[in-house]
Amino acid sequence: MGDSAWRAHYNSELRAEEIRAVIAAAELGERPFVIGHSFGGFMTMKVASQYGDTLGGAVIVDSPIRSPEEEARHPLTRPSMGNRRVYETFDAALARFRLMPEQPCDNPFIVEFIGRHSLRRAEDGWVWKFDSEAMGSRRFGEPVREYLQAVGCRAALIFGEKSALVSRETASYMSSLMGPRAPVVEVPEARHHVMLDQPLGFVAALRMLLDSWMRNESAEGSGPLRATRDN
């Protein structure tokens, strides 16, 4: 994240167009699947609500939309990435790398790999690659609930059993917005960063969804599902 050029401003319209540009540049063909995690899931909702007729399906991964009642009881904090910070050495910067929200992970080598590829050399030391303007807290000000309700293609939700952001109550509420034919898949033992701490379970969940969609263009599934974990 951060290897591409930075923009003067960011919004969901721009991000949706850039998702479409990536699909075209990668030559993914007609009706590709779009899969987005966390904030990327919100932008998946946006592109699927605006251009759903061009997609084969959209998979939202642990992107929380809570009911007004749950939000009142447990309001979500929207962290900002903060200002640019310079570290004297690569190792000093890497030691500060954290998942957001913080969580334990049984696969620290994956976290370290991401951290190593999230840094770049600057004139005065080492800095994170991301643009703080792109990652500011105001990016959560989009009407994502409306995007989810307006999704114009097959959609599914994957969430972690132990996620700090998407509870089963949250998943149930999102299911009500998506409709009864949208699969909801819970990955056992996974937290918010599903693909890091339970990568095999996450892949199993994705395969289950995408294989079902590809086998039967009209099959959207129904009801909550639970991914199995290979031993």
Where are these regions (language model features)?
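Conserved serine/cysteine hydrolase catalytic core
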Residues: L119-L177, P183-E186
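Conserved catalytic-core motifs of eukaryotic protein kinase domains, centered on the activation segment
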Residues: G2-H9, E69-A72, R168-E169
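Conserved alpha/beta-hydrolase catalytic His-Asp/Glu region
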Residues: E88-E142
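Core-facing hydrophobic residues within beta-strands of well-ordered domains
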Residues: G29, T54-G56, R181-A182, A190
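Active-site loop/oxyanion-hole signature of alpha/beta-hydrolase fold enzymes
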Residues: M1-I35, A204
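Catalytic histidine-centered segment of alpha/beta-hydrolase-like enzymes
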Residues: V187-V203
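Gly/Ala-rich beta-loop-alpha elbow adjacent to hydrolase catalytic centers
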Residues: G36, G40, T44
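Flexible "cap/lid" loop of the alpha/beta hydrolase fold
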Residues: M45-S49, T54-F90
